[in-house]
Regions:
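Conserved amphipathic alpha-helix within the SDR
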Residues: 57-60, 67-71, 76-92
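Flexible N-terminal pre-Rossmann segment of NAD(P)-dependent oxidoreductases
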Residues: 1-19
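Conserved glycine-rich cofactor-binding loop
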Residues: 17, 22-26, 48
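Rossmann-fold scaffold of SDR-type NAD(P)-dependent oxidoreductases
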Residues: 21-22, 94-102
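NAD(P)H-binding Rossmann-fold N-terminus in SDR/SDR-like oxidoreductases
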Residues: 26, 30, 104
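Aromatic pocket-lining residues of Rossmann-like dinucleotide-binding sites
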Residues: 35
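Conserved mid-core segment of classical short-chain dehydrogenase/reductases
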Residues: 81, 104-116
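Conserved glycine-rich Rossmann-like NAD(P)H-binding loop of the short-chain dehydrogenase/reductase
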Residues: 38-54
Length: 116
């Protein structure tokens, strides 16, 4: 993705801190890259922490900026709390969230538990 593919001005997200769940691959990775190019500090998380680490390194190598990887299973409430506490303490408050992580659960929404 190059800047000509983005419809927003350079630096639009300078000073912002965004968390993208499921940010190691696919659409989450693409959105994380877009936020990074617009100037945001980007945090990505996913169950496969190693994949997130590789993505963070690749994005920073390609575009500079700051991408922080977190291994986190969002189905575990305590893991989410630990991750967001760590972000807050080490980096400051989040200013944006893309809840991209997904699962394929064939069920009525009201029948789903917090764990899917």
């Amino acid at each position: 993705m190059d800047m000509s593919q983005l419809m927003f001005r350079d630096g639009l997200m300078d000073g912002e801190r965004v968390l993208v769940t499921g940010g190691g691959t696919g659409l989450g990775k693409e959105m994380a890259e877009g936020f990074l190019k617009l100037g945001a500090e980007v945090h990505i998380c996913g169950r496969r922490g190693g994949v997130c680490e590789e993505t963070a390194e690749a994005l920073m190598s390609a575009h500079g900026g700051k991408v922080v990887a977190h291994g986190c299973d969002i189905r575990v409430a305590e893991a989410i709390n630990d991750m967001t506490d760590q972000i807050w303490m080490n980096h400051g408050p989040l200013t944006g969230l893309v809840n991209n992580a997904a699962g394929n659960f064939i069920s009525r929404t009201e029948d789903l538990s917090i764990r899917g």
